Each structure stands twice: as structure tokens, then as C-alpha cells.
A protein has these predicted regions:
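N-terminal capping/small domains of soluble enzymes
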Residues: 1-97, 103
Length: 104
């Protein structure tokens, strides 16, 4: 099988393929390293990041339904300073684009 060019350009951002993670459930990807090679993704879309740390919603945050589950975490995040100091250096070690979900 020959190599197929799967590169895409989205609003001027060149990605090697259109595969990206869903914001929220993937965090910044640390927990998924043993399951997913981040180098193979077109981009990592990180969990929402706010200027200040945000504790999110009170429990319960998850409700099971017949067809799956619903969640309402409430954009819990450690804030921009933590993200810049910890998550950006982690993500930069991979050959993939970083899409930051800015909330607040």
C-alpha cells in the first residue's frame, strides 16, 4: 500500500492528518500515553484552560443514561499559569499541533 497524504489545512494551520482529540476528556494527553501515540495525531485539543484556576461543578458530575452517560464537570482546570508551565512543555515534545480550548 502506498503512502496516502492525509494532511489538512484548517484556517491556515497545517496538520499532518485530521485526527484530533476531543477537548475535555483527553486533558493534555498525559494519561493516554500508554494507549495513544500522540505523535500520530494531527493535533491534541486540550481540556479548557481559564486565566485563573477553576474548581468546576459540585458533585454529582456524571449521570448514566440508557444510551450512555452525561457529564457536567464545569470546566475544572488549574489555570493558565499551570498550563503554560507544565502542560505546554509536555506537549511540545510531540510532533503534533496543540489546540488550546480557552474558557472563562
Amino acid at each position: 500500500m502506498s503512502n496516502i497524504n492525509t494532511a489538512v489545512n484548517i484556517c491556515g494551520v497545517e496538520m499532518k492528518n485530521p485526527v484530533t482529540t476531543a477537548s475535555g476528556t483527553f486533558g493534555s494527553g498525559r494519561e493516554f500515553g500508554e494507549f495513544v501515540d500522540l505523535n500520530r495525531l494531527g493535533a491534541v485539543t486540550v481540556k479548557g484552560v481559564a486565566a485563573e484556576a477553576w474548581k468546576g461543578n459540585n458533585a454529582p458530575r456524571i449521570a448514566e443514561t440508557y444510551g450512555g452517560m452525561l457529564n457536567s464537570v464545569g470546566l475544572q482546570n488549574p489555570g493558565a499559569d499551570y498550563f503554560i508551565e507544565n502542560d505546554i512543555p509536555f506537549l511540545r515534545q510531540f510532533d503534533t499541533k496543540i489546540i488550546v480550548n480557552i474558557c472563562g
